[in-house]
Structure formats: structure tokens, C-alpha cells
């Protein structure tokens, strides 16, 4: 095994396209990070194979903050940009999003997670820093919406490309098979705190790395991943 670096931070997104939740301890199951993308709002009647209501249609989605309640039976509550806190399955939240998006939507719960490709995503901090520098934009890892950011030893941007086809060990027990690069879209032009789209971000990714940034992976061995855990690359998957 060769050491790649360490986990810089771990995240999940309880509601697809809403704000991230930082994790000091990320439980990883065979389906991905537990409760990641567990809920999604769907555009009713959309013929698209990706019918989700996302920041592309409603940039303010990114400024809706989900959290788990402290009840005996925890549930997801969503704080809107106006400061209202609404249950994930409430008509009030659905109607709020419908008014903002100007289209009908419905809530889709999915305990396996609503993913576009694969359940686990990873990206190096070197790639994040390079994209920011090359595009002249603030360094904001969360615009890429990954589960794990890896602080790499060699600090080379796009180093994740070399992880494809290999198995990574994250911490003491978790093993993931890196299956493909992550093809990016206009979502990465949107900052997590709002503001105008920064198209230069996507331009750099398209020109330098075929519109790919970060990688997808499937879970081979479940366990727990924490910031600071070491990351190793094993033999080809």
C-alpha cells in the first residue's frame, strides 16, 4: 500500500442539493455515507432522467440548511434562508419550494440515497486549491459537494485521476473501489453561500481535465471515517 494523505474533512447532504452537514465521524455503509442524500425533492412531471430540484433550477436550495432533530425519534428539519425551520415532510416546506421554483415538486425519501452515479465521492485539497487559483475565485471546497476531501502528500492537482481503478483504504477499516471520475456541470459554479454563478470555475475544469473533478467510488468494506484518518491506495480493484 502507498500512503495518499489524510482525510481533511467529511460531509453528507441529508437533502439533495441543500447545504452540507459536517461530520466528525462518518458512518459508511455499503450504500454510502449513512443518511447521505436520504431525501430529494423531485420536479413533478419532469421527463428528465435526473428530475431532481437542484441548485441549477433554484440556486437558493444551497442556502437551505438541514439538521437532525434531538427528539427520541430524530427527523430532518430544514432552516430556510429566511430563518424558518420546517420539517422535511411538511406541506409548508414543499409549498415554500414550489413558490420559489415556480413549479410543482414532491418529496422523495430514499434510505439508499438519491445519487446521480455512485454513493461515495472524493476530491483532493490540491485540486480544490488549484481550481480556485486558476479561476481567480475563492477556495470553497463545498461548491464541489463531495463526501471526503483528502489532504494529499504530493499536492498535485488532478491527482484523483490516478485513483480510478484502485482501492482506497480510508482510516482503519473502510475500503472503497474508485470507479470513475466525476463529470461536473453548472452546479460547481454556485457557491454554497449564494451569489452569482462563477462560470470560470467550470471553464477551468473543462479546459484542464475534460470537465472532470473528483472521483466516484463504491464501498467494499463499511466502517467509520473521521477527519485525520490516513488514506492509502491498495492494488488495482
What kind of feature is each model-predicted range?
Residues 1-237:
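Metal-cofactor-dependent catalytic cores
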